[in-house]
Amino acid sequence: MTLLYVPAFAAETEKEQMQSTVLFQANQIDDPNMLMLRAELGVDERSEIVKQATNVFAETDLSKEQADLYTTTQLIRRERKTDGTIVEEYASVAVARSTGTGSSSDQETENSVTVYAMVNYKYEISSDLNMSFGISNTKHRAIYASSVTVNSLYLKNEIDNSYEQVASNSRTISSVTMGTWYTLSAPTSKLYPKASANLYAFTTAKLPGGNEANVRCVVYCNSL
């Protein structure tokens, strides 16, 4: 005799679905070729109101002669709650790619390193246009040639909040696997008013001789 087993969370999931309508949903892009292509093209899927409320950009300590910088943002999910609140989930990625002839997303030139920092974040926009946001998590990766030695990968995320102390989380990957995404949990699950916080993801590849390759993905809030 076959018994039908209904998980305990099924009723709650159905209840949650009744409370909101999913307007859009996509799988997060992590394929290196597709992600690098989108970054080179500057693909930005933020809604117009979020574009007005935020700037997304990449930073690095490397000089312009040492690295090219790229950003891209993917819309992961959009839903509407019964009270009219719109919830949008995004993945913004910053890429710093060492300059060199013939470099690409998968096959880097000798001695080049490409580092990625991704911020996964959520925006809530109420019917009266009040906005709040927070980090879901961050992801970090380095791609490099077989001739390159990466001693460790330093990961950090941060919320710079004008009302409270900065919330941050970090860890170091001592044994790095080339091309692997490493996930860092959010420093807090709290959502902040739009004008009170900025979101950051940092990736630093530590190289021999005290050298490093780094990139920061910054989601900076504007005042409308």
Predicted regions and their residues:
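Generic detector of low-complexity/intrinsically disordered segments
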Residues: 5-6, 37-39, 43, 64, ...
